[in-house]
Structures are given as C-alpha cells and as structure tokens.
Amino acid sequence: MRIKEKPEDFVVIEKTNFSIAEPSKYYDQFKFMGIKDNGIPGDYTIYVLKKKNLSTTQAIKIIAKQFRLSKYRISFSGEKDKKAITYQLISIYKGPKKSMFLDNLELYYIGLSDKPVKLGSHLGNYFEIKVYAESPKGFDVFPNYFDVQRFGDKRLVNHLIGKHLIKNECEEAAKILLTFVGKESKKTIKVRQLIKEYWNNIEKLKKVIPLMPKALDIEKAYLQSFIEKKDYCKAFKAIPKWILMLFIHSYQSYIFNETLKMYLKNKTKIIKIRDLLEFYFADYYENIEIPLIGYKVNAKGEIKEIIDYLLDKEGITIEMLKNKKVVGTYRKGFQKMYDLKIKKNQKWLTKFYLEKGSYATVAIRSLFLEPIDF
C-alpha cells in the first residue's frame, strides 16, 4: 500500500471552533473550518495557513522572515504533515493585517482576536487521502497508536533519548542524540561517525564543530555546550526546553503503544502489520483510556498490570517521573473514522474525520490492513 506519492494525495483540513472579530474578505472562504465571527478584537491577528510540502515549523520560519518579526510571536494548534496540502489556523501577536502568497505557502488574513491560537486548541482534522492499494478490507475503528513520526523523522530514536533523560542517564542520551545514524545525508553520517570515534577526546571533538551541517543544529548546540561545561547533563540546557519535552513525550508515546499492543495481543481477530513500526489491529471498538505515563496518572486492572510490567522492564520509577516533572495524562485506546467515504478511481479516495491527536496513517492501515510502503 502506498500513500503520499505527491502532496496532492494527502489533504488535511483543521476543524476548529475559534472565534474572530472584524472578519476580512477571506472569512467566508474558510468558514467550513468551523471559524466563528463572534469574537472580541484584540492584539492577535488570525490567519489561515495553506501549505504544500512544508512542515508547519518550516512555514512559520518563512512567515516570520517575510513579515520581519520573531517566530515566537506566531502560534498554532498542531503540527501538520509535511508531504501534504494542509489548512490550519495560526495567530501572530500584533501581526500585519495582510495576506501572503508564495509558491508553497498561502497565508490568508481573516480577522482579529483577543486571544492566540493555542497548542491543542483545534477539535480534529478532516482528511482526503488517495491510497494506492488493492481494496479496503479492514475496519473503520482502530487502536489509537502514535505513528512513526512521533519517534523521529529520519531516525526513530526520540523515545530512546527521552527514556535516558528520565533516568538521568545523560551520557547515554547524548550518545544517541549525537552518534545514532539514520536515513541521512553522507555528510551527516560522516559527522556522527567522527563524534563516535572521538567520544572521549575533547580536543578532537572541537574540530568536528565546524564540519556539522545545518541539519544538526540541535546536536551542534549540545556538543558546543558539552565541550565548554564537560558535563553531559548540564550540556542539555543548551537545547530548547520544548525539544527536551518532545523527547520525553515520545517516550510516553512509546509506552502507550507497547501497552496497547500487549492489551490487544490476547484478544480475538487480531491482525498484525509491520512496516516501520509493529501494529496489532482489531475489528471492534472499546471505550477505554490508557495513561500517558506520569506521576499523577493511575491505571487500573489489566492496563495497570501491563504498564507496571513495562516500566519495571525499562527501569523507570514514579520517582524518576516526578523528578522530571512528567505529570502524565490519558488518551483514548481506540478511535473511529467519522463520516468515512470511499471512492474508487485509479486509486482509492478516502475521506474521513478524526478527533485531534489521532493519526490518519494508523487509520488507513486499519482500513486496508496493509503496511504502508514508506
């Protein structure tokens, strides 16, 4: 099964209930996203961002540069797929009341608000996905796994770094951050190999710094800090806090996935799919919540037994989670594809709605019961 052969094959439209004031001429064009015109005017300028073949983070950097303002004045509700055409709401603190039209990015000014668009404030996403596969033979309900992008882009290691950070095993976390090789450029791989070779030689590590490509900006910040401080833990302070939290959230996601897999393993009619990750799918929906581990969440029954087993195996304690201020939360164990429509042409056009936090790629696997050819 193939998806995302080109950006037009994967369309994502954010659903929101955000309220604006003083709607612009573009407001009617985007009312279908759920935007309301009963808001209060204020210091936040609201836009619809349409992007193609760009991550949300890349798009924000371009907007900041074009408008000559700090990217930290820009906020959005959630990161959208890169190899796709996506629509989402963004806000800029005291941003210009104008639109922007570039090759892969269109920004439509739609109004004002007294509040910003906040992370996680959208309701869900509509999807239109072209699937190159034989035929749908699966289910419109699915175990609510985190998909591969949660664990990294070209290296599926974010959860491993997060695990070692929680355990305060800073050297181990640093080794994975700096030396683990993924599907990267030859230059990047060479730099990682040099760092591994020079691991215990500060003077030689200094010579690697000028060789590090732009793609390794996080690694470069860490290595420079380590050379200066000579302390694996203190050097992590050179990395933005939100990135460190991303590693820890990735580990929470890993434990969630493993819990859900173990929970499903003994059930009936389980279908196993393996591509970059391993998934178990089932033909039923169950209304359960599974913790994203933290010191303030409590599991019960079979779920508790599984999580206790996994954390013991991983060497993670509640005290460690408390020390890293990992509070935890809950996530639905199963999800549904709402308003599902499927049409056959040369490929399968699937249209559906998912609540926020669920992955369309996981839903598609469940529907077609095939691994995705990345």
Curated annotation (Swiss-Prot):
EC code: 5.4.99.27
Domain TRUD positions: 141-340
Transmembrane portions of the chain: none
Domain of life: Archaea
Molecular function (Gene Ontology), one example: tRNA pseudouridine(13) synthase activity
Record's catalysed reaction(s): uridine(13) in tRNA = pseudouridine(13) in tRNA
Enzyme class, broadest EC rank: isomerase
UniProt cross-references to Pfam families, sorted A to Z: TruD
One Gene Ontology term from the biological process aspect of the record: tRNA pseudouridine synthesis
Keywords: Isomerase, tRNA processing
Catalytic residue positions: 81 (nucleophile)
Family of this protein: Belongs to the pseudouridine synthase TruD family.
Function: Could be responsible for synthesis of pseudouridine from uracil-13 in transfer RNAs.
Protein name, UniProt field: Probable tRNA pseudouridine synthase D
Native source species: Nanoarchaeum equitans (strain Kin4-M)
